[in-house]
Structures are given as C-alpha cells and as structure tokens.
C-alpha cells in the first residue's frame, strides 16, 4: 500500500512538471507567432500550425534575430531543454541505477523559466529597436 501511494505521489509530481513544461512550450509557441507577425511580410506562409521548435527554426532564418534565436534552439538552449525534460519525464524509470543526475527538480525548472524570460525580454527589446 505504501509503494502504491509513493508511485501515485511521484506520478502527480511528474504530471505537474509535465504540465509546467507544456505550458512553457505553449507560451513560447504563441510568442513565436507574435514574433512572426512582426518580422515577416504578408507573403510568407503562416507558421501557426507548426510545432514550437519548427516555428523557432523558421524564425531563425531571419537575419535580424537569428543570433538571438539560434543559441536557444540548439543543444542546451531553452527549446532544447524543454524537449529534453519532457523526454525525461516520459521515459520509464530504471530502478537498477543507484544514482542519476538526470532528475528534474524545482531548481532546474526555475532556471528554465528564468532563461526563457530573459530570452523573451531580449528578443522583445531587439524587435522594438528594429
């Protein structure tokens, strides 16, 4: 009974973390739509139906903002971290491992949120100046 309770509590925590990551990804997706409206002319194909990562890859082709976007869609960037954390939450847990540093804790999620906030602020400032 205690084992089942622990599993359920762990599942709830994973669900909360996963919902947080989905919310952050959705927020960045809507922000990508906003950026697209500001930087692209009307003759380009709309990106609203694309996934978050594909939207940002498409926006990275714009020379005015590519230096800000490319580091965040490549390895170690905000978009990549969101995807990596989602994969960690979905992956089955291995009980045969004694320790692992791949767990997702509140500190990592808070750092991800701070990084995404700084990235959005920098991009907004850049777009306002151009």
Range-by-range predicted roles:
Residues 42, 51-115:
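Long, charged low-complexity segments
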Residues 32-52:
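Short acidic alpha-helical/loop segments enriched in Asp/Glu that coordinate divalent cations
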Residues 16-37:
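Short, hydrophobic, well-ordered secondary-structure elements
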Residues 111-130:
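Glycine-rich, aromatic-bearing surface loops/beta-hairpins
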Residues 1-5, 18, 56-64, 81, ...:
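Intrinsically disordered, low-complexity linear regions
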Residues 1-16, 129:
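Charged alpha-helical initiation segments
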Residues 12-15, 19, 104, 111:
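A structural signal for alpha-helical segments
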């Amino acid at each position: 009974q205690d084992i089942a309770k622990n599993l359920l509590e762990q599942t709830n925590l994973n669900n909360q973390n996963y919902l947080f990551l989905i919310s952050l990804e959705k927020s960045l997706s809507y922000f990508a739509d906003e950026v697209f409206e500001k930087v692209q002319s009307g003759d380009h194909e709309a990106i609203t139906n694309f996934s978050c990562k594909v939207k940002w890859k498409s926006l990275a082709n714009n020379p005015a903002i590519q230096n800000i976007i490319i580091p965040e869609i490549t390895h170690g960037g905000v978009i990549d971290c969101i995807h990596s954390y989602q994969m960690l939450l979905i992956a089955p847990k291995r009980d045969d491992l004694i320790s692992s540093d791949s767990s997702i804790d509140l500190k990592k999620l808070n750092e991800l949120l701070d990084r995404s906030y700084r990235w959005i602020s920098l991009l907004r400032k850049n777009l306002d100046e151009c």
